Amino acid sequence: NVFRWTYASVADFKAKPGMAGVPLLAPWADILDEQAFYANGRRYAFDMELGNVRGARPGHGFLTTVDQWQVTDLRADARSAWVTSTLDVFRDPAWMQQFPFAHRITMTYRLQEGVLEVATAIENLSAEPMPVSIGFHPYVKLTDSTRDEWTISIPAKTHWLLAQTKLPTGETEPIERLFPDPQSAALKDYNLDDVFTDLVRDGQGRAHARITGKAQQLEILIGPNFRGLTVWAPNPSGTGLG
C-alpha cells in the first residue's frame, strides 16, 4: 500500500476522521490570509461560530472528512475497478453559509494496471460565476526504503518564497535555487512545505512528480487544469532546506 492510512477500518475513520489517503481539499485548497475570500468583486466573510472553518488563516477548505458523499456507480471489469461518488454541496446550510455557491462535486476513483486515477467534475448550479480552487493532499510512501534514502523529482520551473506564516510573499525564484537538480533531489537534505508553479508538462498536458527509493518508484501525474504544486515533506529532524 503506497498510501499512509492509520485506521484499522472505515468505522475507526468515521469515529475520528483525520487526514490520510488522498483527501479532497475544497472549496479552497491551501491557506487563506484571512477568515474570508474574494470573488466577483465581493468579500465573503466566514462565520467562525459554525465551527466548520477554523484558524486565523483557514486551510484545506471544510470538506475533507464529510460523510455526505453518495455512491452513484461501483463496478469492475477484467482490467479495472472504479467508484463514482457525488457531493451536493448546496444541500448543507452550514456549507452554503460559508461558501454561497450552489454546486455539485462528482469524483471517480479508477484503479487500472497499477495506476489510480482520480477524475473530478464540478457543476456550478448557482446563478453567478463560482471560484474554483480545489486540490488533493495525497499521503504517500515507499516500502522498500526510508525517507532518508528517497529522491524526488519536481516538474516545475518556479519556486515561490514563503513568509513564516507559509503564505507567499509574492517573490519567486528559479527552482534550481532550491534544487540544483530538480529531477533528482535527495529528500534527506530538505524540510519541505513549498509551492511550485510553471509546471513542466508532457504532450497530454500532465506534469510528472516522482518519489524514488531503492527499487520502487511512485509517480504522481498532475492534470492540465492544475497550475501549481505544493510539496509537503517535513523532515522528522526539523532540519533541511525549504
Regions found by a protein language model. Give the residues of each.
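Active-site pocket scaffolds in enzymes
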Residues: 218-242
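Beta-strand-rich N-terminal accessory domains
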Residues: 1-51, 207-227
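A short, structured loop/turn motif at beta-sheet edges
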Residues: 38-43, 72-83, 110-115, 144, ...
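Acidic (Asp/Glu-rich), glycine- and aromatic
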Residues: 115-151
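Hydrophobic residues embedded in beta-strands of well-ordered beta-sheets
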Residues: 81-83, 116-118, 207-209, 229
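Extended, loop-rich substrate-binding clefts of extracytoplasmic carbohydrate-active enzymes
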Residues: 49-113
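Residue-level recognition of well-ordered beta-strand positions that form the cores
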Residues: 86-88, 104, 108-110, 119-123, ...
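Active-site/ligand-binding surface loops and adjacent short beta/alpha elements
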Residues: 139-225
